[in-house]
A protein has these predicted regions:
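Non-catalytic macromolecular-recognition regions in eukaryotic signaling proteins
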Residues: 1-129
Length: 129
């Protein structure tokens, strides 16, 4: 217990013909035993690719605290492109989780209108007995 993990949300891809600005992200279903500490947004080039799941302190885990966090302002995604910025949920295991973390919500604006989209995503963390 007490382990901290970084869980990558789906990389934003704008399939529309107009740019979007992502204003907020969140994991929708967080079971008991897991606590979301914070969300961050990082450049894929700074992390040498997408770390889907990484444990804090491991040699292969990017040092997110030393990287630029783009979550402080809306992240722009051009029309018809994938973002170079991806979102991470920093989570802590507080008790043995009985369910998975699932569903990722993105809030964004396009052409002055606000939208919400929920995507499938899932994370299962287990605690050694």
């Amino acid at each position: 217990m007490g382990e901290i993990w970084y869980f990558a949300l789906p990389v934003p891809h704008n399939t529309s013909s107009k740019p979007i600005e992502i204003t907020k992200v969140a994991v929708v279903h967080v079971p008991s035993g897991i606590k979301v500490l914070e969300y961050g947004a990082y450049d894929l080039n700074d992390t040498e690719g997408l770390p889907l799941l990484a444990k804090e302190g491991e040699s292969y885990t990017p040092e997110f605290a030393k990287l630029k966090n783009y979550a402080e302002k809306p992240v722009k995604v051009p029309a018809g492109e994938s973002s170079d910025i991806f979102y991470m949920a920093k989570v802590k295991i507080t008790a043995p989780p009985k369910e998975t973390v699932r569903k990722c919500r993105f809030e964004y604006e396009q052409g002055g209108r606000a939208y919400v989209q929920t995507l499938d995503c899932e994370l299962e963390l287990k605690v050694a007995e």
